[in-house]
Amino acid sequence: MFELEKELKELFDIYEKSPYELYLVGGCVRDYLMGITPKDYDLTSNALVSESKELLLKRHFRVLETGIKHGTITALKNHQSYEITTFRIEKGHIKHRKPKELVFSAHLTDDLKRRDFSMNAIAYSPTKGLIDPFKGRSTIENQTIECVGEARLRFFEDALRILRALRFSATLGFKIAASTKEAVFACKDLLKHLSKERLQSELNKLLMGKNAYEVAKEYQEILELVIQEKIENLGFLKNAPLNLELRLLGFFKHQKSLENLRYPKKTCVLFSKAKECHKAFLNIHSKTELKFLLKDYDLEPFNLALDFYALENPKHALKIKGLLKEIFDSNEPFRKEHLALKGGTLQSLGYQHQKIGEILNACLNSVIENPKNNALEWLIEWVKGHYLPNDAINLSPIRQKN
């Protein structure tokens, strides 16, 4: 039924010639049924870790003991890796996330019924075909996300499943079943028990989904609980390109909310600078105004802010892009490094080191307003007319005579 790669076929052959069972399980089976090539493969078996390890080593697979306590090993061959986990039952949960106790089982159904959604609770082997006790294939065909068994219990066991339901809805375009949706809202307060890093990871995947707008609109209350701020602008998601930084810029209002969700410092700084720059675009109507803005912001936050601004004000953004093209085509200066005059030249003329930055900044302001002034001789004369050289204590700009 499924087209399996060579190493995967070999794995199944090993187990079929042994007393043990082996099945593909979870997301890879779901992807196969949807016509999607899986990115990775999870397998499950009634063999204990020690038994699987012995089988695999005999057939020249490398074995990594990646999760012995959880009954998991990784089989490697020809740069391919496969996680194999013993059938298991989870008993009790710590802080609505991790099971208190794992009990290994001899029955596949025990392993499938502990899973989150019916679409992820399907197993497959080449000899036995699909094993689907919770009608997962039907939910895939109906494009529905439905919990295995009682939804509130599934969310109580692992509160991250609440966000996973929303994320799958956004990425796959599936609707959340009525009973599962009711449990999402009923159990939303359990999300406070989860680590910020887990919340951030699921939120990122959700925001990058093709149905992010529809899901965010329907479950805005849940997402506001996650990000701890009021969401004021969802409409941008309808047409926003699949760029995470841009979507974060539109989705969040305050940098502090990103920091609270443990986003990297680089992301938070980029967000802050882009927010500032975005506000300034409303007042940009000339090349000179635009160059002064380019002077203050690196190109990464500038371009990010402009891409977002284009979603809200496409006509004005197009005008700004036209001005930007003129600036770059003409090589007009807007940074200190673009100046014909360098700090070393100022030092050789007797200007003190601590004043050089201020002088170059004044020069830059002049050439931004008139690019023709960006000539070494002109700038030297301009500086001499405005600043005193040598080691004088008072190096304030010279006052111009009326």
Outline where the language-model segments fall:
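Catalytic cores of the polymerase beta-like nucleotidyltransferase superfamily
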Residues: 1-402
